[in-house]
């Protein structure tokens, strides 16, 4: 018997071609899940989430994996366009996805929603006010919806990550920079990036029956950079 068993589970992964998507799909598949990897844009089409779920068919797990490059803007230079664009990518899809998947999960009497978020919502970072606010909204949504749906056997949780190896936020050109390596040693107790597989295996655990007891939880995965 293995702790993480996803045999017979259908998992829908959004934005599966960027950020943690490839690693998540690979690890979930290796643990027996039937992975539906979707790559459509959820930010610009308000009906994309509904169409995505309709195309996927019944899903046991929604992995709400949303990413956008983080603006590096001084707070007094943040414009409305930047604010709206980041929230459109990271926050607006969540209620649309919930409307699309929750009714069927409720009818079946079980389901899971896992949001892949950011630890930037847990610890302040300079010049990231827009991005951190949007990531914080994701986590607040998870906590509220997790409590709302718990009695219906639908678990809603989040990973809040930073310093995890991925091509969107830590491409190879960043990782080889001596200044970045020095930053790792100074800021991250682990002293290295969390590997993509380490992160994906933890996500897989949260998608499994072994994690049925977690309700609206936010789990930092950041090598100790953030812990609350």
Model-derived regions: residue spans:
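Canonical Rossmann dinucleotide-binding motif of NAD(H)/NADP(H)-dependent dehydrogenases/reductases
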Residues: 3-36
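A short, exposed helix-loop element centered on a Lys and neighboring polar residues
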Residues: 98-99, 143
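Catalytic loop of short-chain dehydrogenase/reductase
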Residues: 112-137, 142-151, 163-164
């Amino acid at each position: 018997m293995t702790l993480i068993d996803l045999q017979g589970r259908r998992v829908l992964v959004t934005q599966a071609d960027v950020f943690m998507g490839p690693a998540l799909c690979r690890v979930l598949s290796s643990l027996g899940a039937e992975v539906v990897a979707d790559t459509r844009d959820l930010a610009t089409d308000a009906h994309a989430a509904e169409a995505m779920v309709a195309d996927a068919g019944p899903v046991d797990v929604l992995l709400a994996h949303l990413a956008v490059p983080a603006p590096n803007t001084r707070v007094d230079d943040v414009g409305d366009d930047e604010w709206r664009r980041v929230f459109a990518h990271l926050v607006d899809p969540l209620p649309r996805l919930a409307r699309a998947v929750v009714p069927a999960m409720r009818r079946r009497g079980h389901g899971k929603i896992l949001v892949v978020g950011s630890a930037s919502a847990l610890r302040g970072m300079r010049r990231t006010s827009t991005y951190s606010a949007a990531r914080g909204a994701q986590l607040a949504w998870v906590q509220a919806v997790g409590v709302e749906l718990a009695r219906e056997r639908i678990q809603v949780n989040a990973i809040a990550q930073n310093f995890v190896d991925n091509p969107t936020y830590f491409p190879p050109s960043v990782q080889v920079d001596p200044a970045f390596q020095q930053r790792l040693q100074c800021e991250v107790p682990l002293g290295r990036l969390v590997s993509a597989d380490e992160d994906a295996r933890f996500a897989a655990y949260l998608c499994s029956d072994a994690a049925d007891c977690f309700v609206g939880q936010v789990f930092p995965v950041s090598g100790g950079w953030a812990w609350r």
